[in-house]
C-alpha cells in the first residue's frame, strides 16, 4: 500500500491540473502560433513558466484505485497488475478470465 501522503499529493496535483488546464492551453496556443509577434510569444512563455509546476499534466502519476501503487498500472481497469490479477481470479472484473488453450 502506498503512503497516504503520496496518494494525497497526487489528488492535489490532479485538482491543480484541472484548475489551470484552460490557461495552459491558451498560452501554449499563443506560443505555437505563427501569426503572433515574437514579443507576445515571449510574454506568453514567461506567463507559462510562472504557473505552478504541479499545473503540468506530466507531473501527475496514475495510481491503483485499491492500493495506490504507481507502477504496473492498467488504465483500462484503474488497477495495478497484482490487484487486477486478484480481482480477475475472484471474478470481480467482468469479461476477463485466465487464458487457457
Swiss-Prot record:
Annotated InterPro entries: Ribosomal_uS14, Ribosomal_uS14_bac/plastid
Protein family according to the UniProt entry: Belongs to the universal ribosomal protein uS14 family.
Keyword annotations: Ribonucleoprotein, Ribosomal protein, RNA-binding, rRNA-binding
Annotated protein name in UniProt: Small ribosomal subunit protein uS14
Gene Ontology cellular component annotations, sorted alphabetically: cytoplasm; small ribosomal subunit
Pfam families: Ribosomal_S14
Single GO MF descriptor: structural constituent of ribosome
Subunit-level organization: Part of the 30S ribosomal subunit. Contacts proteins S3 and S10.
Superkingdom field: Bacteria
GO biological process entries: translation
NCBIfam families membership: PRK08881.1
Role: Binds 16S rRNA, required for the assembly of 30S particles and may also be responsible for determining the conformation of the 16S rRNA at the A site.
Name of the coding gene: rpsN
Keyword Ribonucleoprotein: yes
